[in-house]
């Protein structure tokens, strides 16, 4: 079940722990995807805290929010780019998106297959998707004081297997939020140091799993002109069907 948009907004924008989490996840996303001019960047779930750095250079930015969650205007002080949508019917053309971030949209969905099918549909050739979910092995999935304590936590193997079943190829995976989900001043002050330590020690499990995936594009199963030309040209007919007609009339020039 999706969380309410007001609860998500209050956590990420009105608590110190939420701002720490937002910064850690967004910084890691920027390492994977530096802003690039001309890209269409979209987010599904409650991914808008990750999208602000792309507003300046992207061709367009879209924040898709599922109906059960609700929607809020975003970004503040600018033209709204957030849209309310159904999980299985995103209001985007097929192949439009270059970069797609999914946060609080998969683990809380009652139909994750529909979410992944739509993610695959809207992603264009060469596009990348980033799935941000609670890490089954981390502390954040075990406390309901944060949004990552709700829904289904994933292991890396579970998430990658689910992505492959829906036509994605996992490219990179990592964890973030290595400090515990605590409002204690010590942990909040040292959160950045824990993130740096986590990047140096891959075995140190963070509270949130991030998996980057590309869209698989399959070659057509049929080849040759028959696959694309319903009625072959007449010049190709008769090849291999016996002797060809003579190129010249044998009586030509005798009249």
Swiss-Prot record:
InterPro entries: Methyltransf_11 (IPR013216), SAM-dependent_MTases_sf (IPR029063). Pfam families: Methyltransf_11 (PF08241). GO terms for molecular function: S-adenosylmethionine-dependent methyltransferase activity. This is ATP synthase subunits region ORF 4.
